[in-house]
Amino acid sequence: MKRIPFVLLALLLSGVACSDDSEGPKKEGESDPVTLTLSDPNATEETKALYSNLWAIQSKGFMFGHHDDLMYGRTWYGTEGGSDTKAVCGDYPAVYSFDCAEHIDARHASDPDAQALRLRCCREAYDRGMVLTSCIHINNPLTGGDSWDNSSNRVAAEILTEGSATNRTFKEWLDRLADIAHNLRGSDGKLIPVIFRPFHEHTQTWSWWGASCTTTEEFVNLWKFTVKYLRDTKGVHNFIYAISPQMDSAKTVDDFYFRWPGDEWVDFVGMDCYQGINNAVFVTNLKAISKVSLAKLKPCGVTETGVEGFTATDYWTTNIHAPLTGRRVSMVVTWRNKYDPMESGTHYFSVFPGHPSERDFVKMYNQENSFFCSDLPDMYTPAENVTVL
């Protein structure tokens, strides 16, 4: 543990933000009571507690996360207790990101060992007190292609046509997702809450649910259909539903409302921000997402970021920590480090042993407003002065 108590930290950070950064930490009344509303009124107590802590932590700093961090790393795969993050700084990330698409679509029986490993890592993350978030690069249920198959603009329409073959297929996939949600339990026997990011990066054109394949009405109805089916039909009550547009260039508050499903259908405001090392863009978008968070009373976070194959020695303090300091953002999650035991490729987005940014990563780790696993409060016990309905 490297941290000072959260209460003292909140007081110290109250003066971090510049006077024109209205989304930054408040100078007074930080503990003012607030009431938040989840899209699921029947959410589990642990899910409500996590939601309250996602809100509370924004005024204190940001959680560091890494996709697939516990499942594999640059030179290892499936090692129990493994983590590129921990191998560098001695601590696990605060947020564990994973993708469960292969568990639910046509690939669901293709690699049972990998699927068992992924779910084991989810349980280990929860047992350590980490926060879990999941995207789904789900296959195209109309064409049979992958999530990048944007050859048809009929996919969403067919999903929404009750009784169609695509509708039945998509429901089968959601049934499998619901089974995972119902059986994802920690060693305490409780259901594990997950920040669920369906249809991520919907602002882009690469996916079958993206901007070139769906109308605004179709996307909004697809989002609502998915939430209602999981929540109301299948009884999934441990999901926090997160929208995550891709924001690689400078954006405004209005850009975050692109195809917004409605306040009652979104719990968490995310953004996938692959801005490279352009701090001006990152800061602009962090300010915008923070303002959306405050306006909607919904926690927010950077749900994906990173620079593929980066070599900068000061990346973490200069391009991650500095822009995030003083912002009301709960987390920043870097994309994966592909398992590459020969280290012949450059598909990595975070630190690992031997990377030139190791020392700089440790510097970021030691900052009082960067939170890793051992720094977290009990994220599954309600935060003070935050009520969740």
Question: Which residue ranges define each predicted feature?
Answer:
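C-terminal motif of bacterial Sec signal peptides marking the signal peptidase cleavage site
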Residues: 14-19
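N-terminal module-boundary/linker segments of secreted carbohydrate-active enzymes
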Residues: 23-101, 110-113, 363-389
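Alpha-helical scaffolding within the catalytic cores
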Residues: 49, 76-85, 116-119, 177-180, ...
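Substrate-binding cleft of secreted/luminal carbohydrate-active enzymes
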Residues: 58-69, 299-389
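Aromatic-lined carbohydrate-recognition surfaces of secreted/lumenal glycan-active proteins
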Residues: 65-67, 197-199, 223-254, 298-311, ...
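Aromatic- and acid-rich polysaccharide-binding/catalytic face
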Residues: 96-98, 256-279
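Substrate-binding cleft of extracellular glycoside hydrolase catalytic domains
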Residues: 103-228, 232, 236, 335
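Non-catalytic scaffold segments within catalytic domains of secreted glycoside hydrolases
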Residues: 219, 231, 242-258, 266, ...
